Regions:
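Surface-exposed, charge/polar-rich loops and edge strands
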Residues: 1-424
């Protein structure tokens, strides 16, 4: 299939507003579960998910945690400016960023930008009985170093460099966000964030701060379901992909060749890679973010086999890598998933590392050949979205059968909606 010339209009369906779940149901694991197995569709309740999985299988979860990335500042003129954290800039490491005190910098989207032409924004607040002032200063043009300008440019014109300063070196940036940040919820919910979202818009296994959107397939899991998976002998493993706001970016071009995928940052530990090898790279993925992480690993391993001297930055998977590497017949089809993952483990050994830190821009669309993911747990996605393309590629084009069934059987859609288990 000529993937780059896929027309996004071929992946459209009618989604009435009332089918978009504005809030989650009261018990996470009581959501509906659509089961697609070898072309047959049925439905059940999510807490029965373990009954459908092969005993001893490996299941991969994304353990990222959504941060309170939305901050509001009021100018002296009365104008309200929104600063939306997109990606850590200085330091660039997520873990270090949240530990910083006194100063840090982020790449941000700015709401009401036309009202913030110069100067710093300030906000007074209190933490543990201490009064603090947070200031935000935007740097542009000549105020940016060459490296900083390159980082800003990668955002495609929507990101701005913002320096944050606060007057208490005993307070971390994580505490700042907890005090003044607001949890971002998907724009299509068309409502303000509520206190309950702080709990319901996080997975029960979320650990690593960094996402601005939840890996929503995981929202249905409860401790009880996780224990049931263990009882069924499912080998649970976690990876980290920090979900960016680009996950909501609509495809505006007629063909997907014109759509630029966003970059997301991933961390995969040695133990997870060794488990992949043990399971012969046969995986049940929880959510599209886990899919993008795991499938990207294959191409990182291929790159290392071809270029053993490569750095972590060199391992970044570009949008069209899977298609271009396959098209030029450049060894890719001769490299097994196990060989590719072993190459990453060998790379970690050579460099004395316990985890791989890299990034991916991969687009998975019809014409893509899945290398590692064999079963997928996922929610129901927006029409004409890259996530729907990913599902279509997984089901070899049979996505309409799944979505027609969901629409005619009262399933709830999108982030707070119901779930599906897909077995091609």
């Amino acid at each position: 299939m000529d993937t780059i010339h896929i027309k996004i209009s071929d992946y459209n369906y009618d989604l009435p507003d009332e089918r978009i779940a504005k809030f989650p149901i009261s018990q996470r694991d009581h959501s509906k579960l659509l089961v697609y197995k070898h072309g047959e569709v049925s439905d059940d309740v999510f807490f029965h998910l373990p009954d459908y999985l092969p005993k001893g299988a490996m299941m991969v979860f994304n353990n990222t945690k959504v941060i309170q990335a939305r901050m509001h500042f009021r100018k002296e003129t009365g104008a309200l400016i929104e600063v939306f954290l997109m990606e850590p800039a200085a330091p660039t490491d997520y873990e270090l960023m949240f530990q910083t005190s006194g100063h840090c910098s982020w790449l941000c989207m700015i709401g009401n930008l036309k009202k913030w032409k110069e100067g710093s924004l300030k906000r007074d607040f209190e933490i543990k009985g201490h009064q603090l002032t947070l200031s935000a200063t935007m740097r542009r043009g000549n105020a940016l170093s060459t490296e900083a300008a390159e980082m800003v440019a990668k955002g495609g014109g929507t990101n701005y460099w913002v320096d944050f300063d606060w007057d208490n070196e005993h307070v971390s940036f994580a505490e700042i966000l907890e005090a003044v940040g607001e949890l971002p919820i998907p724009p299509y919910l068309n409502r303000k964030t509520e206190e309950s979202d702080k709990t319901t818009y996080q997975t029960v296994y979320s650990k690593i701060k960094g996402s601005v959107a939840a890996p929503t397939a995981g929202l249905h899991f409860t401790d009880a379901v996780l224990q049931d998976l263990d009882a069924h002998g499912i080998d649970r493993e976690e990876v980290t992909l920090h979900v960016g706001a680009g996950t909501f970016k609509p495809v505006k071009s007629l063909e997907i060749e014109g759509h630029q995928m966003h970059t997301e940052y991933i961390v995969v530990h040695r133990r997870s890679l060794e488990k992949l090898i043990k399971h012969e790279c046969q995986v049940i993925a929880v959510g599209t973010t886990s899919v993008r992480t795991i499938e990207s690993l294959y191409y990182m391993g291929v790159h290392l086999i071809k270029h053993p001297e490569a750095s972590e930055e060199d391992l970044h998977v570009k949008q069209w890598d899977p298609y271009e590497l396959s098209a030029d017949g450049n060894l890719v089809d001769d490299i097994t998933p196990v060989q590719a993952i072993q190459a990453i483990v060998d790379y970690l050994d050579r460099n004395g590392l316990e985890a791989l830190h890299s990034s991916t821009q991969i687009i998975i669309a019809p014409g893509y050949t899945y290398k590692i993911v064999k079963m997928l747990v996922t929610n129901f996605h927006q029409p004409q979205s890259t996530l729907l393309l990913l599902v279509s590629a997984f089901l070899h084009g049979d996505w309409k059968k799944v979505y027609d069934y969901a629409l005619s059987h009262d399933f709830r859609f999108l982030s707070y909606g119901d779930s599906s288990l897909l077995i091609p």
